[in-house]
Amino acid sequence: YTPIRSKQMEIQAHTSDDFSILNFKDGTDNQFKVEIAIGTETDIMFTGWLSVSDLRQRFQPHPNVLVLTATDGLGFLKDIDLTDISGDQFTDENKIIEYIAAALNKTGLELPIEVEMNIMESTAPLAPSGNMYNFCYLHALTFETSIGEFDDCYTVLEKILGENSYLTQEKNRWYIKRVDEYDNHDPVSVTFAYDGSTVETSYFELYKKEIGSNSLL
């Protein structure tokens, strides 16, 4: 089971005397931010970072094909120890969503967090505040490996998700879904801001479309 499902986008562009792999040779993997939009520039479907190490281009005269790969940054989390949004160590008890938001913030992407996970504690209200990640707390010691040292952010997310839910990026937001709700045709989700604060409850948009023989796309 894979609870963290990273995504990447591959872009191909023609090179010229002014544009080639040399434009990126001095960059790092979190220097060039990539946004993929459909229709209009504001209709962003994917946000990530250009993976400089994955650039590909044949060393032949222009024009040539330059292949650029953008990743969502989730792989970066394997090398970053858990701290809160401000960069300080967690102490005492904190909401589960605060750990999730702090870990995802280390990707460098301030994206909203969509949670479709409708298991609730028996006394929780039927409101965004009652979402399990917002209502339930975990002690910071849950993720402490030794005194003053914590799991990396990737491991923290794996522990929280377990085999119950998965995390990916969908339509320019982090998306957490409970596996047993995958076939739910009337799903309810809670949107959190990138820092873990509650935004709203909404009925999640279904990813399906009916296409007739005379329909135009």
Give the positions of each predicted feature.
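Beta-strand-rich assembly/attachment modules of structural machines
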Residues: 1-92
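Charged- and aromatic-enriched interaction segments used to assemble
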Residues: 56-215
